[in-house]
Structure formats: C-alpha cells, structure tokens
Amino acid sequence: MAGDDPGVLVNAAYTLADFGENISTMMVLVDRALELNPNFARGWYISGTLRAWAGQTEIAIEHSKIALRLSPRVRVGPSVMTIGAAHFLARRFDEALPKLLLAMQEDPSHPGAYRWLASCYAHMGRLDEARQVVKQLRAVTPDVIPNVSFLRSAEHRELFLSGLRLAIGAEP
C-alpha cells in the first residue's frame, strides 16, 4: 500500500509541495516516511528541502546533514545546496558561501546552486563575483531569475530575488 511506502510518501510530498500544496501537510507526509524508515537518506534530504522552503532553516540544515551522513558517497539530492540555501535564508552569508561553492562543484549542471551563490555574493557586496557566477549560470540555462513560489515566506523570496537582481545589474 502506498501509505506505507516511504519512497511514495516522500515523492508525493515533494511534488505536491512544489506545486504549491500546503507545505505543513507535506512535511507530515515526509515525517511519516521517516517513521517508517529512519535510515531513508532521500527522505531526510526531502525533509531538509521542504523545511528550507517553509523557512525552518535550522531543521533544514539538520535534516540535510543527516541525509549526507546516511549516504556519504551517493548523493540522494543536492543536500549541500540545501544547507547553503538555509544558511543564506537565515542571512548567514559567510556560512552559506562555502556550501554553495561546493554544491556548484558537485553538480555543475544544476542551476539552483549558481542562483543561490550569485545572490549570496551580491548580498555580501561581492558584485564582481556575483556577476561572474551569473555568466556561468547562463551557460547552464538562460533563466537567471526563476519562479520562487516554492519559498513560502515573502521575505525569503525577496531576499533571494533581490540578490539575483543585484547580480545581473538590475535596479533593486
């Protein structure tokens, strides 16, 4: 039965949250999956991601670290990027920076890491580096500024987007 399959629960929760469903309800589904299998690295990764989207940055970091510990060699998702993004959303740009650099190195084809890194550099006042990252991002995708409705907090959306606008040289 799907209700007892951690993989189905986690995938459904992530997909529905991405489409804008109630994130608290989706986190309950992920929590259920982790009750069924506490060693499910992908479940911890998705939990960290949803917690970051919900603005629960400390829990996002903790759950993403668990995913990395459970699956240190085979990545089950961009947990390092989630940790960097959570530090960024908590306005700890100095802590976010090394994680986002590592995330970009781990998966140079993932545009998310470039976006978070460019925004982080911009908020640190390092605009030349932010613009260089945007150049690299454009080699991966033409979409520099994405839809950020996954971030449930208007403050977090604006923090991320304002950094990207600075990085591309747009007016704040």
Segment roles from a protein language model:
Residues N11, I46, V80-T82, W116:
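Canonical tetratricopeptide repeat
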Residues D143-P172:
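Terminal, low-structured helical/coil segments at or just beyond the last alpha-helical repeat
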Residues A122-V144:
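TPR/TPR-like (Sel1-like) alpha-helical repeat modules
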Residues M1, D31-E35, L68-R69, M104-Q105, ...:
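Conserved structural position within tetratricopeptide repeats
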Residues F19-R32, A54-R69, A90-L102, R126-V133:
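Structural signature of tandem alpha-helical TPR/SEL1-like repeats
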Residues P6-G7, A41-R42, R75-G77, P111-G112:
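Helix-start (N-cap) detector for alpha-helical repeat units in TPR-like alpha-solenoids
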Residues G3-D4, P38, P72-V74, P108, ...:
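Short coil turns that delineate tetratricopeptide repeat
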